UniProtKB/Swiss-Prot annotation:
Domain of life assignment: Eukaryota
A family per Pfam: MatK_N
Family from the record: Belongs to the intron maturase 2 family. MatK subfamily.
Listed HAMAP family: MatK
Source organism of the structure: Aspidistra elatior
Location of this chain's protein in the cell: Plastid, Chloroplast
Protein name: Maturase K
Swiss-Prot/TrEMBL keywords: Chloroplast, mRNA processing, Plastid, RNA-binding, tRNA processing
GO function term, MF aspect, one: RNA binding
PANTHER family registered for this protein in UniProt: MATURASE K (PTHR34811:SF1)
Annotated function: Usually encoded in the trnK tRNA gene intron. Probably assists in splicing its own and other chloroplast group II introns.
GO biological process: mRNA processing; RNA splicing; tRNA processing
Chief localization: plastid
Annotated gene: matK
A GO CC term assigned to this protein in UniProt: chloroplast
Length: 520
């Protein structure tokens, strides 16, 4: 109990003050503007926002001027309500939408400051060099490759959402004590429900993983996930030497429910303490591994199917009692690893069984020894990626390439750069696939879509256009992967890259999931 209280007090001692004045600093909005222009890997900001770089800088300066005006947020919300429901002027709606996006990005940048400082100080205390490599998404897969081959069952978990926005704000109160900033953030979330970039239901619950989601909501959602993972990890680590009565101390964080009546808090604590006493006895599995990214998590175990069902029951009750989030049973699937493929981080992952027989000779007798080896395998989900390309209007649902009419107003070099950028990102992200044939099919769709787009711009056919410019125009769509491999591994033999389509390579510079994967 004292250990947990000391840990919580240590966290509270790092709470940050005086974030509110940063909302009136011009460089914050400049950072938000720069993030809006360069934050996407797949979609271009010109398409999303509808303005060029020069005019957007003017809009940012205009926004900074309006921030100093009294009741700016209220007038912004009122303008948005009139524009959306009465019949709006396009320019006014565009300005309101742009200003709202900039304010949302600015809130995200400000609230990330204390957490970024805490992360840097943590790695400095632990003396961990090159900690940026630990941020790579690909670093998860070698961990899975090493651990899952020894486990039996896996639970595929969809973390429940939407979450009530008041709970999200109250979670931040554990880390930030700047009351004006928190009140302004609460007002911003409540009043900003009618714009497309913030999808909030009438009950003011946030759907975090929508296509229109922005940086602020992802940060708030990650804070919510960190809160319950903090308790989950502590329970997992401390079961061996803490008595069951100590688990009631988790509920001493009643500042999370400061505005609830005292009687309700008391009943809540009693119910949850009884719940912990009933369920924590089964947390004695030394081979339990947990991996999460975005709204999905994997819980793998060497235990039995009954143990996994108990963990499932534990998650449901924990979300319900602690966060008031109701979760449906279909959000957690329990499967045996030997005959199950799960979709995670843009890959279809499975555990392959390899059977082999070895003949053993002992004196005059010989016999066969059958052995089974397990191998963690990852492949490109071609069907999912084709569906993503179809949503982005690069092909039909059956995978037939089509032109991109919205890009025909761009120059030829810009069109080639955009298609080439998408192909390079896909090759880079899916470099860990054991079978590259599916990735080559995706690149072929993008290559032909690029050719159709250029041919449509020049009012020609694809065959005529390629005959006139030559096939070398689109070679980068297929040679980029070998160039990357040649830079990483010096080509000592002429046959080094001959089998590169079978090599799996995990990079340490991929810090976010590919946007095409997010659409699938």
């Amino acid at each position: 109990m004292e250990e947990l209280q000391g840990y919580l007090e240590k966290d509270r001692s790092r709470q940050q003050h005086f974030l509110y004045p940063l909302l009136f600093q011009e460089y914050i909005y400049a950072l938000a503007h720069n993030h809006g222009l360069n934050g996407s890997i797949f979609y271009e900001p010109v398409e999303v926002f509808g303005y060029d770089n020069k005019s957007s800088l003017v809009l940012v300066k205009r926004l900074i001027t309006r921030i100093y005006q009294q009741n700016f947020l209220i007038s912004l919300v009122n303008d948005s309500n009139q524009n959306r429901f009465v019949g709006y002027n396009h320019n006014n709606f565009f300005f309101s939408h742009f200003h709202s996006q900039m304010i949302s990005e600015s809130f995200a940048i400000i609230v990330e400051i204390p957490f970024s400082l805490r992360l840097v100080s943590y790695f400095e205390e632990k003396e961990i060099p090159k900690y940026h490599n630990l941020r790579s998404i690909h670093s998860i897969f070698p961990f899975l490759e090493d651990k899952l081959s020894h486990l039996n069952y896996v639970s595929d978990i969809l973390i429940p959402h939407p979450i009530h926005m008041e709970i999200l704000v109250q979670i931040l109160q554990c880390w930030i004590q700047d009351v004006p900033f928190l009140h302004l953030l609460r007002f911003f979330l409540h009043e900003y429900h009618n714009l497309n970039s913030l999808l909030i239901t009438q009950k003011k619950s946030i759907y975090v993983f929508s296509k229109e989601n922005k940086r602020l909501f992802r940060f708030l959602y990650n804070s919510y996930v960190f809160e319950w993972e903090f308790l989950l990890v502590f329970i997992r680590k401390q079961f061996s030497y803490l008595r069951l009565t100590s688990y009631g101390t988790f509920l001493e964080r009643t500042h999370f429910y400061e505005k609830i009546e005292h009687l309700q808090i008391k009943d809540f604590v009693v119910v949850c303490r009884n719940y912990f006493h009933r369920t924590l006895w089964f947390c004695k599995d030394p081979f339990m591994h947990y991996v999460r990214y975005q709204g999905k998590a994997i819980l793998a175990s060497k235990g039995t199917h009954l143990l996994m069902k108990k963990w499932k029951y534990h998650f449901f009750n924990f979300w319900q009692y602690y966060f008031h989030v109701w979760s449906q049973p279909y959000r957690i699937h329990i499967n045996q690893l030997s005959n199950y493929s799960f979709y995670f981080l843009g890959y279809l992952s499975s555990l392959l069984l390899h059977f082999s027989a070895v003949r053993n000779q002992m004196l005059e007798n010989s016999f066969l020894i059958n052995t089974i080896t397990k191998k963690f395998d990852t492949i490109v989900p071609v069907i999912f990626l084709i569906g993503s390309l179809a949503k982005a209007k690069f092909c039909t649902v059956s995978g037939h390439p089509i032109s991109k009419p919205i890009w025909t107003d761009l120059s030829d070099s810009d069109i080639l750069n955009r298609f080439g950028r998408i192909c390079r990102n896909l090759s880079h992200y899916h470099s860990g696939s054991s079978k590259k044939q599916g990735l080559y099919r995706i690149k072929y769709i993008l290559r032909l879509s690029c050719a159709r787009t250029l041919a449509r711009k020049h009012k020609s056919t694809v065959r005529t256009f390629l005959r006139r410019l030559g096939s070398g125009l689109l070679e980068e769509f297929f040679t980029e992967e070998e160039q990357v491999l040649s830079l990483i591994f010096p080509k000592t033999t002429p046959f080094f890259l001959h089998g590169s389509h079978r090599e799996r390579i995990w990079y340490l510079d991929i810090i976010r999931i590919n946007d095409l994967v997010n659409h699938s």
